[in-house]
């Protein structure tokens, strides 16, 4: 009986997901109408399953990866890469490039909006739907929506901010555009609300639990808030949120056995997308198969991120460098070991929180505490002396650069590198713009390098264009001015 109920919920969630797959142009497919759905708490739970299913869909997960990696330095291209991929890598992005396709992300956002809009209707109709269950479902939908908007705002800056769902023809409206600052304020507001509604954990257990790792928990919301506050350069709030995660005592580093993190089952995971029991891993085709478009940038990884050790430790290796490459093939095999199609995509894990906290502490003048966190992480990962800058606690800028170097080692191929480099570059009103100039110098083909350097000095170029087809659909959308030149 339990199996039947579970599959019914999954099926209903799938129908909901598919019924709204044209959100941004606001053309609903009227699969499940308001009158037919939203009558019981099971309907709301099914909608929540649909939300998480939309995150695991190929287009969403692949866009999270490409937005966070393709313009950076750790992922390169193979001969199977598309022309659009090559244009992105050479910083010659057009408004027709598929990297600017946000439709799958907005479909997932619409699923969140529908739950937020109509869960109250189910609560009124179903007396068994408790206030706690209702708040939890709403909180998770708010948190997932915020997570997706945070990716969008860092990728495009000024975007449509849709807070109401589209489920029928009369819902069709032109939503226009909100500034990046407005979007970030909404994200913060929603995450703080979710923090009140979402429980600490969904399953009360001291060890790893797939439900706790696969659904948004209160620590996951705190990790998102810390990430948002880093982007906003509000370091006292980063310190506050990361401290509360550490205070749970629940999370810990497992040491050098990195494949275990991505294979599932460790207490490093705060929030993940699980593919443990499915061979339909959307990352497999773009990073591992023979005709994959993306490859590890082996030269930069081996020479800059994971250089060889020196002196008496010449035979020692950073466990993180050993874990991300399959020999010299360039496969993106961080996500799994012998069977890379069964990886878990880590959205937030404990080491990420430690590094966010270390950065905030350094920005707040607490260099000794920041270095202690870095030392703890490096010791567990068996980091080598060649990557230890031997910084004093008073060298706060040096510590911050050390943190970013450790983020490159720790979070390789996790969809975060471009956003890290952009965040470092734009800090203090773009005081570090040369971070991006140096990046372009390393990754862009020589024949177009100077042109790319000139482009990257324009801060508008750091955000993707609105796809041309979206501009045709909604006349209120305005193109990023860089792409009008």
Labelled PLM ranges:
Residues 87, 299-350, 356:
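Flexible, polar/acidic helix-loop-strand segments at domain edges
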Residues 1-28:
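Bacterial Sec-dependent N-terminal signal peptides
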